[in-house]
Amino acid sequence: MTTLENPEMQAQLLSAALPYMQRYENKHVVVKYGGHAMGNPELGKAFARDIALLKQSGINPIVVHGGGPQIQAMLTKLGIESRFEGGLRVTDEKTVEVVEMVLAGSINKEIVALINAEGEWAIGLCGKDGNMVFAQKAHKTVIDPDSNIEKVLDLGFVGEPAEVDRTLLDLLARSEMIPVIAPVAPGRDGHTYNINADTFAGAIAGALAATRLLFLTDVPGVLDKDKNLIKELSVADAQALIKDGTISGGMIPKVETCIEAIRRGVEGVVILNGKTPHSVLLELFTEHGAGTLIVP
């Protein structure tokens, strides 16, 4: 008999989860949803059920999502060629229209529908709604390999959060609604900007002084040099691991985003594997969690 078929084991699991449910009651938990989980229907359903259970447990979940592969697929379908500078996509006027259509349209509404199918009341938003987020143009620099001189890249309508107003999010929390937010926002200059979903989620979590910010990724978390999962890191520990090369490659910007979220007032940020079914519940409602927790 499996655990799920054993009533006594089910009761024990629920009982063990109770202290964690009480810890997060009435708290804000921001979940950045992306990676492999978004392309897998079963994982998508499991994620939606996790978010519904958080709400039913008295927690205020906020979902921020990405959608890079879906954006690229739509650009290809429409015959819009992508241009890159220093390995980064340039978002011109045509591209940002597609970005908004895909992120704030199809992907956003798919996630909303999945959560609503679990009996909750989710609402799809982007940074434009309720003047929630205003963006500013992002400035990226790279070192020219030939001249070794720092070069400023113009990536078009790629932005970063400049202002976050939590008024609408507080209203939705009081109304028992679950915000699902696409990382698209207006600038004070009147343009629409595409914002990195991790950065966007960190800004939202900081504005809410969230108890937890969860980044669902395609990896278990931060690994040590022996490829073992590190369960918890302070900001100082994380910075030291970047410096000595333990944290490298694509994990560096992810961890730096976590550190910035902590500086903005988030109590703890977790990098965890979104390919593990119900990883959100495992992280929040079990003793050992499911990823790497970064704390001040």
UniProtKB/Swiss-Prot annotation:
It is found in: Cytoplasm. Belongs to the acetylglutamate kinase family. ArgB subfamily. This is Acetylglutamate kinase. InterPro entries: AceGlu_kinase-like_sf, AcgluKinase_fam, ArgB, Asp/Glu/Uridylate_kinase, NAGK-C. Pfam families: AA_kinase. The keyword Cytoplasm applies. It comes from Brucella anthropi (strain ATCC 49188 / DSM 6882 / CCUG 24695 / JCM 21032 / LMG 3331 / NBRC 15819 / NCTC 12168 / Alc 37) (Ochrobactrum anthropi). Its EC number is 2.7.2.8. Substrate binds at residues 67-68, 89, 194. GO terms for biological process: arginine biosynthetic process via ornithine; L-arginine biosynthetic process. NCBIfam families: argB. Keywords: Amino-acid biosynthesis, Arginine biosynthesis, ATP-binding, Cytoplasm, Kinase, Nucleotide-binding, Transferase.
